[in-house]
């Protein structure tokens, strides 16, 4: 195997027109890897820190020249000479170089860019697809897509409180068919919204962001779109929600303010509301149903719905094994959202997925609202046989890049490719 001979970072743009970090890694035998780093709009309190310059004269303070400099001046000299396949050793070095709990010294955006680019360079040098390099010969499960087709909350400028309403084509026989179903429902939803006189502009993640009257109207409209596309809600297609409750939570009164609906709810009332929605609609997954620090609320939600609904921790667990271990011990949630930039290295990302699986939790590999053309998460989803991916609507190139990569992977795998559909929810007792 050959050593790393050069590491270079530059400032580029993400899908929201904000700067982000791109890293290139070169090896002595001609291996090359490039990675771009995503960023979130609603971020968890305990996430690894994304380093921004704060210089208001450039990009409204959102520049990443400091993170780029950290790669070029500090990280590069430390990892040049490493065997490119020594992912664990390189990631360990990156963590030690930073020396902080939350990667605030060098920036998670600097560290992650390097970690991902190293893996890509190693795969390139071995002439292997990235998913196979990361996951070995058993990497063959295509994920069920969790497609965000209606947006509210921090991802949209409207009066819907719930941040994401998603569809999951669980009845498909292959990923290709699932993607087709999702795209057809997406177009069907556009037609339904037009008929109702609603706006059909899309939000950060490619979903529509109309000014609906209530959260329930969003669910009803999606059901209508599924049926109009010729599919059966609750059989072929399930619904999923990302509530992003930390954005609704008011620390002063300890309650949830659903401003779109003009109501204030306690944790218990939020749980009761979810129970009501689950009884009326085919909802199979709820993400961040309560605030990231409302462990008692999450425990109650898990007790009430944890056997029949996937309860995903995003802000709650922030792809962090310490937070996840606490959740497992307390019996909170039954699934973790995996965002590579929440933790900052590939090794730690894989550790979180492994810990989740050992505890019988599902793992959902996810994009961020600020994305790029980088499709690494598609390969990670297959490499880890995670079974689910959350990467937006089948619209906007930054989202579709991941879906197209999954189509390529399914093609490469041929007859060995697996699409588990509803069986991906292995910990639910339906």
Swiss-Prot record:
Signal peptide region: none
Gene Ontology biological process terms in this record: glycolytic process
Similarity comment: Belongs to the enolase family.
Species for this entry: Geobacillus sp. (strain WCH70)
Reactions catalysed: (2R)-2-phosphoglycerate = phosphoenolpyruvate + H2O
Residues involved in (2R)-2-phosphoglycerate binding: 163, 339, 368-369, 390
Involved pathway(s): Carbohydrate degradation; glycolysis; pyruvate from D-glyceraldehyde 3-phosphate: step 4/5
UniProt superkingdom: Bacteria
Cofactor binding note from Swiss-Prot or TrEMBL: Binds a second Mg(2+) ion via substrate during catalysis.
Keywords per UniProt: Cytoplasm, Glycolysis, Lyase, Magnesium, Metal-binding, Secreted
Protein purpose: Catalyzes the reversible conversion of 2-phosphoglycerate (2-PG) into phosphoenolpyruvate (PEP). It is essential for the degradation of carbohydrates via glycolysis.
InterPro entries cross-referenced by the UniProt entry: Enolase, Enolase-like_C_sf, Enolase-like_N, Enolase_C, Enolase_CS, Enolase_N
Compartments it resides in: Cytoplasm; Secreted; Cell surface
EC numbers on record: 4.2.1.11
Name the UniProt record assigns to this protein: Enolase
Cofactor list: Mg(2+)
Predominant location category: cytoplasm
Pfam name, any one: Enolase_N
A GO molecular-function descriptor: phosphopyruvate hydratase activity
Residues noted as binding Mg(2+) in the record, renumbered to the chain: 242, 287, 314
Record: active site: 205 (proton donor), 339 (proton acceptor)
Coiled-coil zones: none
GO cellular component: cell surface; extracellular region; phosphopyruvate hydratase complex
């Amino acid at each position: 195997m050959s050593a790393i001979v050069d590491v270079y970072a530059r400032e580029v743009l993400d899908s929201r027109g904000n700067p982000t970090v791109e890293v290139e890694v070169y090896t002595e035998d001609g291996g090359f890897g490039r990675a771009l780093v995503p960023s979130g709009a609603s971020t968890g309190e305990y996430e690894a820190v994304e380093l921004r310059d704060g210089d208001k004269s450039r990009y409204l303070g959102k520049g990443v020249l400091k993170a780029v400099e950290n790669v070029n001046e500090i990280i590069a000299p430390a990892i040049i000479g490493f065997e490119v396949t020594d992912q664990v050793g390189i990631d360990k070095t990156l963590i030690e170089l930073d020396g902080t709990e939350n990667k605030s010294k060098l920036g998670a955006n600097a560290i992650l860019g390097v970690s991902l680019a190293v893996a890509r360079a190693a795969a390139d040098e071995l002439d292997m697809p990235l998913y196979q390099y990361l996951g070995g010969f058993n990497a063959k499960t295509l994920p069920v897509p969790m497609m965000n087709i209606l947006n509210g909350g921090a991802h949209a400028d409207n009066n819907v409180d719930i941040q994401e309403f998603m569809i999951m084509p669980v009845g498909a026989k292959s990923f290709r068919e699932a993607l087709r179903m999702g795209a057809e429902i997406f177009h069907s939803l556009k037609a339904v919204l037009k008929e109702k006189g609603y706006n059909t502009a899309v939000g950060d993640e490619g979903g529509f962001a109309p000014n609906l009257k209530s959260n329930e109207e969003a669910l009803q409209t999606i059901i209508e779109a599924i049926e109009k596309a010729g599919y059966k809600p609750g059989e072929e297609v399930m619904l999923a929600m990302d509530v992003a409750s930390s954005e609704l939570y008011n620390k002063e009164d300890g309650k949830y303010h659903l401003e779109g609906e003009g109501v204030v709810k306690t944790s218990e009332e939020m749980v009761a509301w979810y129970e009501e929605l689950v009884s009326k609609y085919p909802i199979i997954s709820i993400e961040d149903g309560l605030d990231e620090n409302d462990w008692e609320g999450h425990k109650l939600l898990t007790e009430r719905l944890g056997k029949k609904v996937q309860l995903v921790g995003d802000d709650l667990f922030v792809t962090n094994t310490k937070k996840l271990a606490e959740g497992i011990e307390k019996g909170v949630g039954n699934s973790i959202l995996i965002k590579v930039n929440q933790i900052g290295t590939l090794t730690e990302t894989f550790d979180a997925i492994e810990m989740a699986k050992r505890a019988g939790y599902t793992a959902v590999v996810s994009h961020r609202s600020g994305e790029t053309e980088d499709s690494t998460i598609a390969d990670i989803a297959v490499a880890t046989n995670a079974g689910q991916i959350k990467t937006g609507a089948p619209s906007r190139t930054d989202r579709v890049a991941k879906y197209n990569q999954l189509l390529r992977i399914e093609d490469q795998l041929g007859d060995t490719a697996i699409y588990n559909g509803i069986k991906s929810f292995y910990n639910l007792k339906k």
